[in-house]
Amino acid sequence: MFRPLLRRLVIGLILQSAAASSVQAQTTDDLFNDSVVQTLEITIHSRDWDTLRANFTSNDFYPADVTWNGLRVRNVGVRSRGLGSRSGVKPGLEVNFAHYSSRGEFLGLRALVLDNLTTDPSMIRERVAMAFYRRIGIPAPREVHANLYVNGDYAGLYVIVEPVDTVLLQRYLGENAGWLYEYHWLTPYFATFLGENLDLYRPYFEPRTHQTQSTFDLFDPVRELFRTINSAPTGSFRDALNARLDLESTLRLIAGEGFMAEWDGLLGYAGMNNFYLYRPPSSAPARLFPWDADHTFQAADYPLLAGAAENVLMRRMLEDPVLRARYFQLVLEAVNAASSGNWLVNEITRDYQQIRDSVLADPFKPYTREEFDSAFAELLTFARTRPAFVTSQVQQNR
């Protein structure tokens, strides 16, 4: 009499254990699996959600629960985020798992960014750009589209973005004990030497690690980096700068930006923008990490060297014959990475087809269906014609 009951109980426990193990076995690779549109749920007090949207220019955090694929994290901090993309209708969000508990995390991540996709009618530029950076060997955040639900209601299509933080540094570099700075655009800045006063560098380079250290410890190396960029003698410029900034990865990053017609990056039309600076704890040179690439793929005939003459770093690197030759070689490698196997065309097409239903269902998107489809067509034209244009630019300038 009891044996069938016992057998059912044992089977139930086994199935329950297997299900739990399946949930526990999930990793960030599953979260950033871009073969599907992910689903993310936020449960937050309705009053807090209304306040967050009403005060969308504020950075105040509100407690919430976050659920993904059966995993639920309680009492995380959620706030509005962004610069020009801030919105009270479809707010960009930061989800900080460690805001209310220093030990808080989700799949090893301390935070996530939810990009609201309000500045790009194609809604795929950011994700395609970061995938391209990774394809050409640049450490870049992982990204994946997700349908976001808030308190059970569809809040629209977002992109989940991996933040540039100590977790990302550890994954890419194998260490994270150094100094990480987030660059902030304040005024047009073109890598000039700001002067001896260390406080002049603080507004542009916000420390994201070691924030309690002295002003000297935090900003003297930053000042000396820009002193070297501006003042190192021509004959020793390359060696002097390479001791402070990894020139190979910097040139590779700028080559990627150049191919993608990024007009709001290191060579931005209004000065440098959208990057992080990392100084390792050893004597190794600093590295740059890209961020916020939703202004890429702007025009197929955008000049490859746009902004190069104004930016002191790029201008001086191009004046060095070795660095100039290497830069144009890396640009051609970027062209090949985009063209090989029709990668860029295929990536744009795949992403568009994957998200189209979610875009059309998004009640808060600031674009019409026609604008979305038109933006996709423009991206395809870019992908098909940009390689030949950039190749001709290299031939004219190398």
Model-derived features with residue positions:
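Phosphate/dinucleotide-binding and metal-coordinating scaffold of catalytic cores
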Residues: 25-398
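Bacterial N-terminal signal peptides that target proteins for export
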Residues: 1-10, 16-18
